[in-house]
Amino acid sequence: MKFNKKILMISAATLMLVSPVTSLANANTVSAASVKKVSYAKQTTVTVKKKTPQLFMATGGRALTTGKYYKKGQKLTVDQLGGMNILANSSPDAYHIKGTDYYVWAKDVKAKRALQDIDYTSRGLTTVRTNKSKAPLYSFDAEKSTPAGYAFMKGTDFKVNGAMYLYNAKTDKSELYYHLTNHYHTMANLKTSPDFPNRFNTELVDTGDAFVKASDVNFFSGKKLKPINTAASAKDGSKIAILENQEADLKDLLGKVDSVKNSVKYKLSSSLKRDNYDLAVRDAQTQGNSRKLMSTAEAQYLIWRLKTYESELDGAKVKVGNMNKLTSNEKLAIGLLVISVYGKNTDKESLYGYAKFNKGNDKTFTLTIKDMHNQKKVVSTKTMKISDFAQKR
């Protein structure tokens, strides 16, 4: 792959991170002395108060049991505490047992020290919320890129995985933006919603790779994102040709795409995460093969996207006790993984894939994929090896 090293002008935009404002009801004054600071431990010992099941986490943070139990009085070293999905309105807390793939219900143990409570399914994720109707989307050059005829409602939540300054050559300004993690979003169809924003009809829309301006959103939850660059570097980098080390990094990242796609972490990631990685690869390949001049700012961004989306691939096989004798919960865990891998919801199709296990056969299952937009018509059926989705614990 060859990159043209001539100077390229790339526009971008800058944004200030907006933090939610917290107010005290009735203007009450709280003194510093009255606020007790909690010191959380990185790990602690818990003592089992009563016989309690050994848990493992399936796809979607689903809590399932292994069939084994912890005994009353047993001591365990734990290093995380968080809510687990039990298909109910609540997500009860469970401790992760250090050095294992197992968990134990928090209510059934007594902890020596406090651990900070996290959300297992959303840890590492960041959500921002629009503070106005019709908040626009932007491309890397800071030009508005909202699909024509569509708009976001006030209060729309976005999963974002990066914050960066982009330079807009037309306005000669750098502003900060959040990078949207996914490229499919629910939007109001303005053509069929004449009373927007009071009433509206929505559709799932492919917005492509996009940003939202920080001033148009408020931080909602998750990890605070630190910008990967500065306003000055965004402007300066748009006027400097791609650097040799950046060219080498891009070649290395694109050179290992086949290896990534053949890995378990890719194959067993959700279809959404695979699509996100695929889009980052396609965009980097397109930019690298085009005659368009590439700047160091654009190269930095393409490298960041490839590394970020590869790191978000999290596919893994279900760990089971006996590959020749699966428990009902182990089969359920495999089934949940299959749904995540083969389910797909885009602006063009809605597919649902599920596993059917045959009695007395723990070697294979039948994968069925249905088109949910076409009266649940069966698209395909295929015999799959369980060993491609599970491994001995």
Where are these regions (language model features)?
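Gram-positive Sec-dependent secretion signals
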Residues: M1-K37, R393
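Short acidic, gly/pro-rich beta-turn/loop elements at beta-sheet edges
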Residues: P20-V21, N26, A58, A114, ...
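Beta-loop motif signature
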Residues: V30-Y177, T181-L204, A214-A241, S259-S270
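Generic alpha-helical hydrophobic packing signal
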Residues: K75-T77, V109, Y177, T364-T368, ...
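A short, surface-exposed beta-strand/turn
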Residues: V104, A111, P197-F219, L306, ...
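Beta-rich interaction/scaffold domains
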Residues: I228-T364, K370-R393
